[in-house]
Regions:
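Active-site neighborhoods and metal-handling regions in enzymes and metal-associated proteins
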Residues: 1-254
């Protein structure tokens, strides 16, 4: 069953989303050559503590990090370590926090200096696809309308979508119903209703869709070694327009 949030619950989700977005923006500003991914994870821990929130990821199915931090061909679920960020890298960060019992979940991809033109195109187009996907999060539409849009747009631009990991409902739990894949048929899946909150989570590869899991049993990488982009927003479905909850300044799409 897909939870429908009441007004006071939605307000708590707004606060959680704003907090997650603020922490992600702060972490993004710290990305620079020579910084280790472990230092970024530690900074995330400190920022969460200062904000009076806790990580939604730490300990989840025994995940060892406060955030997911992944570089280049690493798609998602990377773990902070002694690895140093280099000029030309693309650093992906996924932040999930619990505030007053409610979760905010958001992700972004940060280019370090100048990246390869095709990689820059991947990042730009993935952000544009996310914007388009969010605009479809309206009552009466179905999850498959979002899924099909993402897949169609990615393929149109010569990219591929990751099939092993998907977007999801979010609220009191990190992963609620419905699943929101980045592939599917238009008109399929659950119908969206006002009061639902979903994480639209794009993972789009420059090359092929095939994924491998590293020896740490967490980090997912592209099998062909080409870069991947990761962007995510928590979105509230309303009777008027989709509301992005994971923005430092609240965004309401027209």
């Amino acid at each position: 069953m897909i939870p429908i949030k009441r007004d006071h619950e939605i307000e708590k989700m707004r606060r959680a989303g704003e907090c997650a977005a603020s922490i992600l923006a702060d972490l993004a500003s710290r990305i620079a050559p020579g910084v280790t991914t472990g230092e970024i994870d530690h900074a995330a821990s400190q920022l969460m503590s200062q904000a009076g929130v806790r990580s939604a990821f730490l300990g989840y199915k025994k995940f060892p990090g406060h955030i997911c931090i992944s570089i280049n061909e690493e798609i998602v679920h990377g773990i902070g370590s002694s690895r140093r960020i280099a000029y030309g890298d693309v650093v992906k960060m996924d932040v999930g926090i619990i505030r007053d019992g409610w979760i905010g979940d958001t992700a972004t991809s940060v280019p370090v200096g100048i990246v390869e033109p095709e990689t820059e195109r991947l990042l730009t187009i993935t952000q544009q696809i996310l914007d388009g996907a969010v605009s479809l999060a309206r009552p009466g539409n179905r999850v498959g309308d979002i899924s099909n849009f993402v897949e169609t747009e990615a393929i149109k631009h010569g990219f591929s979508v990751v099939r092993e990991f998907v977007g999801h409902g979010v609220g009191r739990q990190l992963h609620e119903e419905p699943q929101v894949p980045n592939f599917g048929k238009r008109g399929s899946g659950p119908k969206l209703k006002s009061g639902m909150t979903i994480a639209i989570e794009l993972m789009i590869n420059l090359g092929k869709a095939k994924v491998k899991i590293l020896a740490d049993k967490w980090t997912a990488v592209t099998a062909d070694g080409l870069p991947s982009a990761h962007f995510e927003h928590t979105v509230l479905i309303t009777d008027s327009a989709p509301e992005v909850l994971t923005c430092s300044a609240k965004t309401l799409l027209k």
